[in-house]
Amino acid sequence: MKAMEKDWYQKNWTLDIHNMSWVEDTNRQVDFLINQLQLKGTEKILDLACGFGRHSLEFARRGYDVTGIDITPAYIDYANEQAKKENLNAKFICQDIRTITFDKEFDVVLNMADGAIGYLEDDGENHKIFSVIAKALKNGGKHFIHFSAENLVRHSRAGMNAA
């Protein structure tokens, strides 16, 4: 992500995370994911563009081994503090998701609330995310994308088809 774009993102997306109405839906959303993905509780989960870790933390509370990645330092700091405070099996890494290098380590990869897909400069950047996902998933792994606003997801189709 270019410096100017990263600065814009930090300024406009670092919000008061505790006063978001959608935070209340987290338990219901995790229940839905467990049901739809037919999870058993032993899966290793990667949450891309995890924000402050609301889904990651809830999965960890339910016994899953979770890794969350986000580019916003304040969100990652908060998520790591919560995981430590609650003694959860979750780790959070501050990094651009296009640059992570996992190799068939995860049973599930999540892109919740778009997970950065469609917010990037062009289809090539979206393709990088799908390449990361393909490399991170174990054989037979599952990928779930939640598109929160179709009109915000400009470039997702080409990336999905190319991965």
Predicted features along the sequence, with ranges:
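Conserved class I S-adenosyl-L-methionine
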Residues: 1-40, 42-51, 142-163
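Class I SAM-dependent methyltransferase SAM/SAH-binding core
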Residues: 56-99
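A conserved beta-strand element that flanks and buttresses the S-adenosyl-L-methionine
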Residues: 110-112
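A short acidic, Gly/Pro-enriched loop at the edge of an enzyme's catalytic core
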Residues: 101-108
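A short glycine-rich, Lys/Arg-flanked "PGG" loop and its adjoining helix->strand segment in the class I
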Residues: 125-139
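A structural alpha-helix within SAM-dependent methyltransferase catalytic domains
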Residues: 34, 57-60, 80, 130-134
